[in-house]
């Protein structure tokens, strides 16, 4: 009986990409897998053909040989480096079948790995909101959440009385059951002990043998100085309690820093925009600036300061986390143009503008308009 074309089996074109091959095989394998068709020999044979096709087409070298020689590339005595499918597949199918069957599949050589002590608890995430001042000073934040906690009646064992548990006779303590189907070893969680490998004789009435119950947890979280939005605080063992005394998961607390009315932050540096009067920018002087630590600092504004200029205050920013250092604070100047001037004030400004040395007083604007004038003169003369 002649073999079907591998590309036709998977419904693919000759130039199919590896991702298309994997997608097609996943779809067909789900349809014909023996677990989905118990006792159906035709489906089992179809599944073997599909797996054989996938094993060849997903491998670059095997695919090249198949494209050149067809099925004869893998026949005994072909002289072309034949592949013996009776020895099993070299391709790792586990990622495919983990997606399809929830992680219970083992391709080729099977594994008996099982975590001792039962199913560990899940990690949990909790988001909190803090102020920039909280981040600067460090703080303690009360939190509460509901999760599985260790049962107080049985101390997490799930059992009442002195006899805790006995070995499961179905899986013999392994927690899983293996069956051989064609080329594959299928490994499933034991349905009798739910993968624990043990059976409790007298289950705790409070937790029904799970060793844990749902309850509210109240904690006080220590937020370190300098923490930023997106950082996380890990609380070991404060996540979900494990099943029947297994290890608990961790709790991850993610702080979100509220928008500040005055400062913006970039790492350990702080930034703020400060409007100053035109006269102060022109003549120079000083301004009083608040810092995040609550102190005030006298800051010198240089004579002739321009809009957008930055003034730097060293080590007036945020603490660097787990360090004694601090970032800097940057003050960006916004020069405020006077409005609602009186007639007399306007006259004084006009008089100033008419002074003979105003060109030297305004080099940027004077230079700009000189360039514009030169540009138009060049156009007219061309």
Curated annotation (Swiss-Prot):
Zn finger residue spans: CR-type: 138-216
Sample GO molecular function, one term: zinc ion binding
Known cofactor(s): Zn(2+)
Domain J, first and last residues per copy: 5-70
Pfam family, one: DnaJ_C
Residues that, per the record, bind Zn(2+) 2: 168, 171, 190, 193
Binding site for Zn(2+) 1: 151, 154, 204, 207
A biological process from GO: protein refolding
Cited function: Participates actively in the response to hyperosmotic and heat shock by preventing the aggregation of stress-denatured proteins and by disaggregating proteins, also in an autonomous, DnaK-independent fashion. Unfolded proteins bind initially to DnaJ; upon interaction with the DnaJ-bound protein, DnaK hydrolyzes its bound ATP, resulting in the formation of a stable complex. GrpE releases ADP from DnaK; ATP binding to DnaK triggers the release of the substrate protein, thus completing the reaction cycle.
Protein name: Chaperone protein DnaJ
């Amino acid at each position: 009986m002649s073999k079907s074309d591998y590309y036709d089996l998977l419904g693919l074109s000759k130039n199919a990409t590896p991702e298309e091959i994997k997608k097609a095989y996943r779809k067909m394998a789900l349809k014909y897998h023996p677990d989905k068709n118990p006792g159906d020999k035709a489906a089992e044979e179809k599944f073997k053909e599909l797996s054989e096709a996938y094993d060849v087409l997903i491998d670059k070298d095997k695919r090249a040989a198949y494209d050149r020689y067809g099925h004869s590339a893998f026949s005994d005595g072909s002289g072309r480096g034949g592949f013996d499918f009776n020895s099993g597949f070299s391709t790792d199918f586990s990622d495919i079948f983990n997606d399809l069957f929830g992680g219970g599949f083992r391709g080729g050589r099977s594994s008996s790995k099982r975590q001792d002590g039962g199913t560990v608890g899940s990690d949990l995430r909790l988001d909190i909101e803090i102020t920039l001042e909280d981040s600067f000073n460090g703080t303690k934040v009360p939190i509460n959440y509901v999760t599985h906690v260790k049962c107080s009646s049985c101390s997490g064992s799930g059992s009442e009385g002195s006899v805790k548990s006995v070995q499961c006779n179905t899986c013999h303590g392994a927690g899983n059951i293996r069956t051989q189907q064609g080329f594959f070893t299928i490994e499933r969680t034991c349905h009798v002990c739910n993968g624990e490998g043990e059976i409790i004789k007298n289950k705790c009435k409070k937790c029904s043998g799970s060793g844990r119950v749902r309850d509210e947890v109240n904690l006080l979280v220590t937020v370190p100085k300098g923490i930023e939005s997106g950082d996380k605080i890990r609380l070991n063992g404060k996540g979900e309690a494990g099943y029947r005394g297994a290890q608990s998961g961790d709790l991850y607390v993610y702080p979100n820093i509220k928008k500040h009315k005055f400062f913006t932050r970039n790492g350990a540096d702080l930034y703020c925009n400060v409007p100053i009067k035109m006269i102060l920018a022109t003549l120079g002087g000083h301004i009083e600036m608040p810092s995040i630590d609550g102190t005030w600092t006298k800051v010198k504004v240089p004579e002739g300061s321009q809009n957008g200029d930055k003034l730097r205050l060293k080590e007036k920013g945020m603490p660097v986390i787990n360090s004694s250092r601090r970032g800097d604070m940057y003050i960006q100047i916004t020069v405020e143009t006077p409005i609602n001037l009186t007639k007399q004030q306007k006259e004084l400004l006009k008089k100033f503008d008419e002074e003979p040395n105003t060109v030297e007083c305004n080099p940027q604007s004077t230079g700009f308009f000189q360039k514009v004038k030169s540009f138009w003169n060049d156009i007219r003369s061309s």
